């Protein structure tokens, strides 16, 4: 496809729904559910050990509870299954399913969860891997992360398009972007 965008779609499910599922199932505040999701969740229950336990903060003065990591995965897996099933339906609707020889590339923070790639491979029946920005000159390690893949990819795509129409040089745009992101992280972390 020569790097051209052939299809885009929106799937109305993401990490916030997973956090909400965890908060409701474990009866814990959302901020604790988010931390539990990031630190312990697994998208494929068979990969999470039943012997591994985590502490789940309770509401109010109640003491934290122990929960097996596998039980947490049993809360998370159905939402990831739904997400990947919707993505597969979108790929089929696009008419490009047979034109994906190298498989599927997952991006975004939700893709980083343990077991996400393996579950996606089960659903898509094709190779799946995590995608992170790699080919932009000057990218710091902070930005070389699946969380930023979409934003950086769109910037690079736009910069290349600008170059072909006589706009600013793509490497100049990428360099300026990296500087601004690095400065932002320096101020906030």
Roles of regions detected by a PLM:
Residues 1-189:
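Helical "lid/coupling" subdomains associated with nucleotide-phosphate turnover
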């Amino acid at each position: 496809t020569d790097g051209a965008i052939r299809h885009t779609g929106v799937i109305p499910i993401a990490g916030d729904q997973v956090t909400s599922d965890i908060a409701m199932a474990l009866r814990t505040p959302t901020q604790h559910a988010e931390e539990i999701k990031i630190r312990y969740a697994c998208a494929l229950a068979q990969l999470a050990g039943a012997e591994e336990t985590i502490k789940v903060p309770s509401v109010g003065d109640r003491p934290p509870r122990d929960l097996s990591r596998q039980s947490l995965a049993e809360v998370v897996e159905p939402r990831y299954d739904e997400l990947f099933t919707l993505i597969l339906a979108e790929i089929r609707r696009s008419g490009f399913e047979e034109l994906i020889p190298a498989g599927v590339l997952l991006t975004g923070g939700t893709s980083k969860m343990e077991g996400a790639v393996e579950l996606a491979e089960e659903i898509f029946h094709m190779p799946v891997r995590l995608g992170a920005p790699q080919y932009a000159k000057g990218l710091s390690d902070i930005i070389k992360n699946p969380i930023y893949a979409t934003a950086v990819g769109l910037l690079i795509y736009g910069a290349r398009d600008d170059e072909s129409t006589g706009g600013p040089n793509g490497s100049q745009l990428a360099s300026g972007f990296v500087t601004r992101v690095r400065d932002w992280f320096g101020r906030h972390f």
